[in-house]
Amino acid sequence: MYKRQAGNSLPADIQYKYERARGRKVLMCSGSDEHGTPITVTAEEKGITPQSVVDEFHTINAKALVDLGCSWSQNIDTRGIEYGGSLYNRTTDIRHKEIVQEIFMQLLEQDLLQKQTMQQYCEIDTEGNVKFLPDRYVVGICPVCGNEEARGDQCDSCGSTYEAHELNSPKSKSNPNAKIEIRDTDHLFYKLNEFQDDLEKHSQSRQKIWKPNVRAMTKNWLNMGLRPRAVTRDLEWGIDVPIDDTEWTNKSIYVWFEAVQGYYTCARIWAEKFASEHPDKENAWENWWINKPNQSLRHIYFMGKDNIPCLLYTSPSPRD
């Protein structure tokens, strides 16, 4: 537990303390990523609800971080609320869900989401029951580099993304001997391809700052050409799709699209909970998210390599 947490969280906490030592205003945000199929699988194995699983691990992780000496218990900076603070939140937070749904509807209204039929793997049991398999529960051979442990829609080895039918020799990770097949299912896709030019310019402006592996993965993705990415999935455990139509009743907002917004939602939730004495009150989060005259604003992210695409391509891309 401690080694796993240390690699991700200690560098961020060190940076937070360094920025404070320099006299700067700083807000540190993170939290527990609590949606997706791995949670439901654990719940089924333990015979408990998904909410019980995430409640247990959020408590364990939050305590472990504080025990490591991280500053998550210091919600308000000791210099005053105007200097910031920290919040370790969670994606099952009701406000996180509400803000994510607000953003989802804004993108829909701006015509940045499109309905599209996609092919998705599903597992068929002996009685003919169908269970759709999330991408990370399908493994096979990458059609680009030949990696034999590629996931259903992405290869972590070369960074390639592809459609379900393009993966070679697919099998269910949880049940390798099960019969699997591809079936059509309708989902909403984020028009990421419309931001190709903007993201290429953004990438060029960051070349002297990003690490070599980030630059390489970015170049690879952009050279392949960005494609629309699904923002909904056939999952029960997740944030409901906020569309009043029975077509979307059994679908949830895709976790990669939802969780990456946690940095933004966490800042807003921090302001709503702790910034009552700040001059801007619940809008205090804007000081860390909106560039203003005579203000130098900077974001620093600490993450695993598998999160690079989400942070690079989905975080900077919305118009508003």
Predicted features by range, described:
Residues 3-202, 206:
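N-terminal, positively charged nucleic-acid-binding surface of large information/translation enzymes
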